[in-house]
């Protein structure tokens, strides 16, 4: 086997339809990361003049004359072919040792286990368990378990089979909230590069990326029609009408409860019901005040949320989503996701990747809300094999750990 640098065209031809490919292993992503302190190269593994594996390698200097590499979502090759993996690993280490690399970080999109959505128990794939052991023997350092979101990319992903997705496949809460009468004031529409700035306002608090990054992201992937920005547009006149009708109904129902409570002032259930209505009515009144303010500012329609997604082969991957938090009474995040997923189902895609969830399925999980929201769409839950460092130069690697440079680079 020979490992050598290959052209972008050679890389694209091999990788674009390979089963191991992801949007992280594309020349588009390489172009993007060139703008953010990474250099890049494409490598190919040839055996008997046949290309049998490739990878995008992002790299940067981390110390004088020392570099590290990153193969996002791993090398593109058959990991289960032991002989191939052994030879590829050996030749890759030799190739990058000559370039003064300390290590190459990888996080392959290879399934380690499938998690039962009800019992939350793992069904580990025996071949994947053997693979992890084999990789360790070959010099791949297995890193943190990444139960939450400690690593470069999520270890646990929720993926919807769009062939099976319908109104009966989601849980009841999800269906009710995504089909609420309030959603009649909402419309899903396709955005453009011009809308990224508005969209960024909804995601900036949960992303460590800049506005420029997302504008570049859209620009780069849009060249191949691989990216969509789907937005929610609200009609405030319709919204106001619906909210006023809802407020009238709730006030009438609260008056009925108040009358019952006056007749039974020591009934605790009635008291709790009354206070619950008081809170909901106060929230509605707050929203109506806010809508009236926007209408006075001549803002009859406004974008209030969106999803950035990548389309690749038969799969759509959610990159990031966000919503305007002004209206706590409007659960339009369910509407946003349900409509987006339905949109791609109609277009004929097979899978929708909801992106990462936490691997902690207990009640004490700090990301319980995120998990519950995504699981309400009844996805399949997969655990990938995790993040590894392929150590190229053990001396350099240990010095980098001992000096704290790796912690500074990767732990935020």
Where are these regions (language model features)?
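A short, hydrophobic/aromatic-rich structural module that often spans a beta strand
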Residues: 119-129, 152-168, 325, 393-412
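Alpha-helix boundary/capping detector
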Residues: 37, 244, 344, 399-401
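Acidic carboxylate-rich catalytic motifs and surrounding loops in phosphoryl-/glycosyl-chemistry enzymes
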Residues: 109, 145-150, 191-195, 355-356, ...
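Acyl-donor binding region in acyl/amide transferases
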Residues: 66-150, 305, 312-377
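Extreme N-terminal starter segment of soluble prokaryotic enzymes
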Residues: 1-2
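A conserved beta-strand-loop-helix scaffold within acyl/acetyltransferase catalytic domains
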Residues: 5-48, 52-64, 140-151, 157, ...
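Intrinsically disordered, low-complexity, positively biased terminal segments
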Residues: 47, 65, 76-115, 125-126, ...
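C-terminal catalytic domain of photolyase/cryptochrome flavoproteins
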Residues: 31, 41-42, 356-412
């Amino acid at each position: 086997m020979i490992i050598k640098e290959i052209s972008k065209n050679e890389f694209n031809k091999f990788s674009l339809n390979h089963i191991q490919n992801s949007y992280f292993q594309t020349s588009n992503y390489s172009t993007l990361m060139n703008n953010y302190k990474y250099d890049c190269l494409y490598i190919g593994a040839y055996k008997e003049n046949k290309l049998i594996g490739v990878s995008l390698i992002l790299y940067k200097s981390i110390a004088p004359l020392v570099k590290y590499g990153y193969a996002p979502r791993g090398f593109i090759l058959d990991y289960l072919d032991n002989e191939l993996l052994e030879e590829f690993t050996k030749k890759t280490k030799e190739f990058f040792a000559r370039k003064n690399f300390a290590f190459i970080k990888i996080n392959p999109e290879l399934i380690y286990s499938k998690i039962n959505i009800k019992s939350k128990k793992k069904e580990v794939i025996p071949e994947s368990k053997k693979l992890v052991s084999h990789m360790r023997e070959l010099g791949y350092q297995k890193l943190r378990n990444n139960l939450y979101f400690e690593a470069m990319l999520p270890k646990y992903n929720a993926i919807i089979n769009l062939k099976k997705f319908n109104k009966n496949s989601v849980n009841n809460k999800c269906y009710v909230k995504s089909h609420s009468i309030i959603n009649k004031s909402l419309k899903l529409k396709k955005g453009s590069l011009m809308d990224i700035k508005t969209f960024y306002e909804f995601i900036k608090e949960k992303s460590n990326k800049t506005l420029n990054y997302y504008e570049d992201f859209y620009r780069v992937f849009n060249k191949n029609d691989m990216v969509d920005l789907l937005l929610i547009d609200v009609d405030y006149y319709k919204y106001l009408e619906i909210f006023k009708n809802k407020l009238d109904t709730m006030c009438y129902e609260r008056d009925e409860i108040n009358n019952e409570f006056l007749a039974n002032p020591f009934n605790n259930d009635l008291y709790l019901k009354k206070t619950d209505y008081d809170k909901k009515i106060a929230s509605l009144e707050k929203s109506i005040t806010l809508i009236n303010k926007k209408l006075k500012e001549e803002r009859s329609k406004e974008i209030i949320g969106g999803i950035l997604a990548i389309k690749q082969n038969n799969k759509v991957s959610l990159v990031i989503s966000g919503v305007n938090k002004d209206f706590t009474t409007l659960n339009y995040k369910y509407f946003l996701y349900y409509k987006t997923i339905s949109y791609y189902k109609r277009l004929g895609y097979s899978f929708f990747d909801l992106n990462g969830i936490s691997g902690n399925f207990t009640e004490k999980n700090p990301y319980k809300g995120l998990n519950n929201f995504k699981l309400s769409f009844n996805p399949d839950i997969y655990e990938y094999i995790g993040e590894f460092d392929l150590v190229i130069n053990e001396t350099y690697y240990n010095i980098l750990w001992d000096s704290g440079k790796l912690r500074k680079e990767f732990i935020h």
